[in-house]
């Protein structure tokens, strides 16, 4: 009985830790690198050659999340446009208003605070 309770606790704890590694809290840009800071951990993304423009509106319609996390205005994950078949890797933090995503081989970075 105690062993099964411990197993359940470890599974729940592991699941919570895994979820916390997918929730972005702050994005920073420095030396052609976008750093996506998660609650636990961070990911550095090379943005050399990124296109500093928003993706056309029609590409953002019909998006369905295939993996990722959403809590309030914080979103992160992989999205697929089922009409065009385009897959987006989206890192969005509503706090910083920065969006980084990849469409195929093209990298997009939008910073609404700087490029309005």
Tell what function each PLM region has.
Residues 26, 44-46, 107-109:
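Well-ordered beta-strand positions in beta-sheet-rich domains
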Residues 37-104:
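Non-transmembrane, membrane-adjacent beta-strand/coil modules in membrane-associated proteins
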């Amino acid at each position: 009985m105690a062993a099964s309770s411990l197993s359940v606790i470890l599974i729940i704890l592991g699941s919570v830790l895994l979820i916390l590694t997918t929730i972005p809290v702050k994005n920073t840009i420095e030396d052609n690198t976008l750093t996506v800071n998660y609650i636990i951990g961070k990911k550095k993304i090379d943005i050399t050659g990124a296109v500093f423009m928003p993706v056309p509106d029609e590409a953002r319609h019909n998006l369905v999340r295939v993996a990722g996390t959403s809590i309030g205005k914080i979103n992160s994950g992989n999205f697929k446009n089922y009409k065009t078949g385009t897959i987006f890797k989206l890192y969005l933090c509503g706090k910083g208003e920065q969006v980084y995503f990849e469409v195929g081989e093209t990298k997009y970075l939008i910073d609404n605070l700087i490029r309005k």
